[in-house]
């Protein structure tokens, strides 16, 4: 079942391909453990359903357009202008755009730039909270891959699918940490509601 879900994720979303990293880690790391070693089973081959999902997507592109990577050409065109750049370059671009584009900085560029560092910090907290390495690996790869986007305008929406962040926040053991998460969530919810009612949507 997990393989089928991974297949569908990779078929419908590029980030779905990233599930291959925690899946392979789970199989390999479990087999290499000295204690509680997990034997590799034939059902573990289901991890290969994940890249097969993306392969089917490429086949659909080829069948419809004669080019397996036609979707990249669509993303590069108007109005998306999507390219791939190094994470550091994109973070710097977010900062520059926040300075140059008045009115958009508070709803697009500052949040996207800050979100990267907040997400990275949450993943580090996950190490302290002993979150399973498969989840941390997926969260890190997902974060890095998402911020390779050379013209990002929906970073917050993309990061909504980074489920390890929610698992980590839900597992914070410190009482003060839990209250801090609750307070921050409430404050941002209030800010979002205010901006929405003010016509920033």
Stretches with model-predicted labels:
Residues 1-2, 27-42, 169-184:
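Membrane-interface junctions at the ends of membrane-embedded or membrane-associated helices
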Residues 8-12, 16-122, 135-139, 192-193:
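Membrane-lumen/periplasm interface segments of specific transmembrane helices
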Residues 18, 153-173:
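Hydrophobic/aromatic-rich transmembrane helices and adjacent perimembrane loops
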Residues 47-51, 174-201:
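Signature aromatic-anchored transmembrane alpha helix within multi-pass, membrane-resident enzymes
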Residues 58, 137-154, 168, 187-201:
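Transmembrane-helix signature of polytopic, lipid-linked glycan biosynthesis machinery
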Residues 110-117, 160-164, 183-190:
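Small-residue-rich transmembrane alpha-helices that serve as helix-helix interface/gating elements
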Residues 121, 126-149, 158:
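Transmembrane alpha-helix segments characteristic
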């Amino acid at each position: 079942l997990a393989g089928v879900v991974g297949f569908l994720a990779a078929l419908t979303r590029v980030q779905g391909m990233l599930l291959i990293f925690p899946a392979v880690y789970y199989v390999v790391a479990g087999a290499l453990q000295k204690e509680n070693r997990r034997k590799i089973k034939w059902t573990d081959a289901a991890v290969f359903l994940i890249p097969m999902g993306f392969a089917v997507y490429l086949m659909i592109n080829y069948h419809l357009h004669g080019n397996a990577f036609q979707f990249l050409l669509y993303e590069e065109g108007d109005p998306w202008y999507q390219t791939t750049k190094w994470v550091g370059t994109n973070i710097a671009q977010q900062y520059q755009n926040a300075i140059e584009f008045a009115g958009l900085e508070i709803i697009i560029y500052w949040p996207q730039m800050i979100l990267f560092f907040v997400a990275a910090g949450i993943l580090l907290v996950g190490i302290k909270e002993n979150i399973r390495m498969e989840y941390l690996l997926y969260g890190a790869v997902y974060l890095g891959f998402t911020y390779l986007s050379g013209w990002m305008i929906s970073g917050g929406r993309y990061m909504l699918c980074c489920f390890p962040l929610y698992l980590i926040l839900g597992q914070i053991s410190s009482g003060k940490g839990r209250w801090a998460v609750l307070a921050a969530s409430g404050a941002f919810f209030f800010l979002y509601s205010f901006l929405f009612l003010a016509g920033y949507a």
